[in-house]
Amino acid sequence: MDKLKFGLVSLGCDKNRVDSEIILGSMNRDYEIVNDPREADVILVNTCGFIESAKQESINTILEMNKYKEKYNCKMLIATGCLTQRYGKELKELVPEIDAILGVNDYKSLDDAIEDFFNLGKKDIYCNYSDQSINEGKRIITTGEYSSYVRISEGCNNSCSYCIIPKIRGKYRSRQFENIIDEVRELSENGTKEVILIAQDTTRYGVDLYGRKRLHELLKEMSLIQGIEWIRIMYCYPEEITEELIEEIASNEKVCNYIDMPIQHISDNILKNMFRKTRKSEILDKVEKIRKKVPNIAIRTSLIVGFPGETEGDFNELCDFVKDANINNLGVFRYSREEGTKAALMPMQIADTVKEKREEDIMLIQQQVSKNLNAKKIGKVYKVIVEGFNGDYWYGRNFEMAPEIDGKVFFKSQSEIKVGSFINIKITENLEYDLIGVVYNEFSK
């Protein structure tokens, strides 16, 4: 078989992106990886199946990629990821255009699937539904060499009533401590300066392997690696955040004063029905404890509106929390009724129009909160990692901003700027979510 050109489309979360990077890095054949699907002989779509809108986007993307079989060079279309893990057999019947289907842990079967198709004309499902391994190995980084996601565990042991992820990704499995450190060391040698730790629950790291939580130890060891300047923590469960973790964030200059702590709601009634392990008082106490120890910390959270049984009172309580808590970065999801979850069977399902209105109301409140917080930053100087140039402004992020989901810092400069470098920016103007500034002491001697 001649050398094939291989294209990949990655949908969904940053954990899916890591899977895609491992897929690209693990292929045994000498493929040529291309960015333009018009050039590809083989196109793989790494799907998301978390909520209904993500499932629909995945199917639409698969059908869109099939057009390249009709009009261009593509001869084989492959689907993998959460959607295929959840609906592999049904997907084969629903979308016959797919030539091979792989589950979330089946990337090692990719070469076989391609060989079978081109040599034997075979179309098949390559899903090992009992595989509880962790996708690890060489990666081809797609986020720019200066910033890389590092997954520290796979799966989830929480049983939130709205979430299908444990059934797709399996039980919680921590990666070996040494493997993670080796990966970060290799990333650093290849130019990575910012490491973003991800998992379904980063704060539980180590419990299954070592009998104790070791996230704070992981941070300490990573910070010793030369070249790593920022370490950012995502997906922290409030009840799993330890004193040791807070102390490490406060004392370790390489660990960003940033924590992503999805709480989903603040009403005890809704939290109970979500099967969440924390209640309002515990969440408020945790936020206060973190801020007391790390005064300038940026807190990100995510919320779900329109959960079954969410009354006007529950929603107003959530609105009051958003107004008062001064959360730096916030995302809102409309509840999605997912088959196979406990919440899907609950009474008092909320109409889509109500969900949409509640999402809009929360984001309007947060927009003003964010604008007020940003106004206090005028005149301050921040270390910013440079991400690019949009034709008018250079842009990047300070420690308060995770890539893609938070705001940006925009600035102009008459000097030569290198993407991936750090630069000091003095803030001169604030927007709702973004900041505008100038290079600090650009022309000073």
Curated annotation (Swiss-Prot):
Highest classification ranks of the organism: Bacteria, Bacillati, Bacillota, Clostridia, Eubacteriales
Keyword Disulfide bond recorded: no
Major localization listed first in the record, in broad terms: cytoplasm
Organism expressing this protein natively: Clostridium acetobutylicum (strain ATCC 824 / DSM 792 / JCM 1419 / IAM 19013 / LMG 5710 / NBRC 13948 / NRRL B-527 / VKM B-1787 / 2291 / W)
Cleaved signal peptide residues: none
Reaction(s) catalysed by this chain's protein: L-aspartate(89)-[ribosomal protein uS12]-hydrogen + (sulfur carrier)-SH + AH2 + 2 S-adenosyl-L-methionine = 3-methylsulfanyl-L-aspartate(89)-[ribosomal protein uS12]-hydrogen + (sulfur carrier)-H + 5'-deoxyadenosine + L-methionine + A + S-adenosyl-L-homocysteine + 2 H(+)
Domain Radical SAM core: 142-372
Name the record gives this protein: Ribosomal protein uS12 methylthiotransferase RimO
Binding site for [4Fe-4S] cluster 2: C156, C160, C163
Protein's cellular compartments: Cytoplasm
Transmembrane portions of the chain: none
Gene3D superfamilies: Methylthiotransferase, N-terminal domain, Nucleic acid-binding proteins, tm_1862 like domain
Binding sites annotated in the UniProt record for [4Fe-4S] cluster 1: C13, C48, C82
Domain MTTase N-terminal: residue ranges: 4-119
Molecular function GO terms recorded: 4 iron, 4 sulfur cluster binding; aspartic acid methylthiotransferase activity; metal ion binding; protein methylthiotransferase activity
Enzyme Commission code(s) on record: 2.8.4.4
